[in-house]
């Protein structure tokens, strides 16, 4: 497995990581046995970057990782573990963002307990609280680092301008953002700012929520995934149009003799040494396809052919609806 650095000051990690939201039922039923098998596959293939959050399954993802590490103590040294906090609920049970020092530290402490570790390798603010100055939040993260509760700090779904403000206070090791062949908005400043500042760009949904694979989600499968059922790119009309476009990409991947997901991952890795994709899946075969993507080096001609069938801006529909956009920062 190729290695990359998790930010200029961070540890070496596998070029390919894993998004552990898939250890919950978000995209369909997940089992502990299936998740353990995925972790075993990762350990066997040198996939070391493991990304989770306190809100994934209300802590279930972290607890499962903790259980796995408890049964395989030697595995702790094989994984670089990242988690997040900052999304909460008000007294009425409605979703809210909370970047206060008290909330972030309390949630990190709870995450450490679920994971069964004294320190995580990377701690993100999951969503930025707009009313709270980001400089203040960075100071909180720096304090948590000084206390030995995390080795590195980051933000998820922030704008390049916010990253620059944050980096003026302390080094930001990683920024997480959706980035793939069907979501290229990070190229409007975030890819560049991360490279300039020595910040890793951790790309979630690198295979476009299944659309950039050989088994894209079909309309009849949407009922089991409420998040995608209301997502603009999966609404009637947009979904069918997107399926039509990606059929050309699947044909290109087949012509290259590679799984479509592997080519999608390889394309992301070609966008910069600081780009680190973290696909999530409940399937061992799909994980093997992603691992294959980290083994492929695309030529200039390959990249040109991909751009020809999936030109920037090709996707039909926004990546989030109005409710889903609460938290992520829009820019450019």
Name each model-derived stretch:
Residues 39, 62, 66, 108-112, ...:
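Generic structural signal for well-ordered alpha-helices
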Residues 8-27, 82-96, 119, 124:
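N-terminal small/glycine-rich loop or linker at the start of catalytic domains
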Residues 6, 18, 35, 50, ...:
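Conserved, mostly hydrophobic/aromatic
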Residues 186-224, 259:
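Aromatic-lined glycan-binding groove of carbohydrate-active enzymes
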Residues 27, 44, 90-185, 189, ...:
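Glycine/proline-rich, positively charged
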Residues 1, 196, 223-251, 255, ...:
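Terminal-tail/helix-coil boundary detector
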Residues 1-79:
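N-terminal binding-site loop/beta-alpha segment at the start of enzyme catalytic domains
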Residues 21-23, 53-55, 84-88, 125-128, ...:
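Active-site beta-loop-alpha junctions enriched in small/polar residues
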